[in-house]
Design a protein with these regions (language model features):
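Short, small/polar residue-rich loop motifs at catalytic or cofactor-binding pockets
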Residues: 111-114
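Glyoxalase I/VOC metalloenzyme domain signal
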Residues: 1-3, 9-29, 40-87, 96-102, ...
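Short proline/glycine- and acidic-rich turn/helix-capping motifs at secondary-structure junctions
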Residues: 89-91
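Short hydrophobic/aromatic beta-strand element in the GNAT-like acyltransferase core
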Residues: 116-118
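Minor-groove-contacting beta-hairpin "wing" of winged helix-turn-helix DNA-binding domains
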Residues: 35-39
């Protein structure tokens, strides 16, 4: 599943523009009085100004061979988020079975052969950088924003995870990721190694914290797919446009 465009809201437009463009180095494609559009690998990332405080989970994919270099590069520019919780945490109910230790700044996902690190952006959204062993695109010399492949995850908090997951599966033909995992009551990844919709129960803590909890905020996604369609996920402010690829 390819995420071509992500449109999110923010109450802190100037700060977000500065963070993603100047701090992280994403190319700035367009800027207006009430929005900014950036390029995150192959994904367009747009922030639209709003009067409300909102919170999102967003992930950038990295080639696995650049993970440590990218982590060091980001850490020089913004504090990484440390894991909170018990001294040793194993999440057997998670779709991805994450291993991590409190106080560390990296999570390993053995089931999908991936690892990630996290930071907060200028509006305190949870920003994840993830590298899969099976994504080994050529990245010689790439550093910083140039190493970002695409937006790989967008969070969609809901009251009933299984109900929305079923709607997405039927409408978009996407499956749980990895395919061997059933849909959990509080958390589901839908998609593939290239992109996932993270359907999570309202109030669920976003890793790596135990205190930043999932809330509803407007999301518009453009995906590449076999057939063009529009999907509105009422009663939530989530809309998906699929363009035929």
């Amino acid at each position: 599943m390819q995420i071509a465009e992500v449109i999110l809201h923010t109450r802190h437009l100037a700060d977000q523009t500065a963070f993603y463009h100047r701090t992280l180095g994403l190319p700035l494609l367009a800027e207006t009085a009430d929005s900014c559009t950036l390029q995150a690998g192959t994904t367009r990332l747009r922030f639209q100004e709003t009067a409300s405080e909102v919170l999102y989970h967003l992930a950038f994919a990295l080639p696995c061979q650049t993970f440590q270099a990218a982590k060091a590069w980001v850490r020089e520019r913004v504090p990484l988020l440390a894991l909170t919780g018990s001294p040793q945490v194993y999440a057997p109910t998670s779709p991805l079975r994450a291993w991590h230790k409190a106080g560390e700044d990296e999570i390993v996902f053995p089931l999908i052969q991936a690892r990630s690190f996290y930071c907060g952006d200028a509006a305190h959204n949870i920003l994840k950088f993830i590298a899969y062993e099976d994504l080994r695109q050529e990245a010689a010399g790439a550093e910083g924003a140039a190493a970002v492949l695409h937006v790989s995850e967008v969070g969609l908090p809901v009251a009933d995870v299984r109900a929305l997951a079923a709607r997405l599966q039927e409408a978009l033909g996407i499956e749980p990721y990895p395919v061997s995992r059933p849909i959990a009551e509080d958390f589901a990844y839908l998609g593939d190694i290239f992109g996932q919709l993270v359907v999570v129960k309202l109030g669920h803590p976003w890793l790596p914290t135990q205190t930043v909890r999932a809330t509803v905020a407007p999301v518009h996604l453009t995906l590449s797919g076999p057939q063009a369609q529009q999907l509105a996920l009422a009663p939530y402010p989530y809309t998906i446009t699929v363009t035929a690829s």
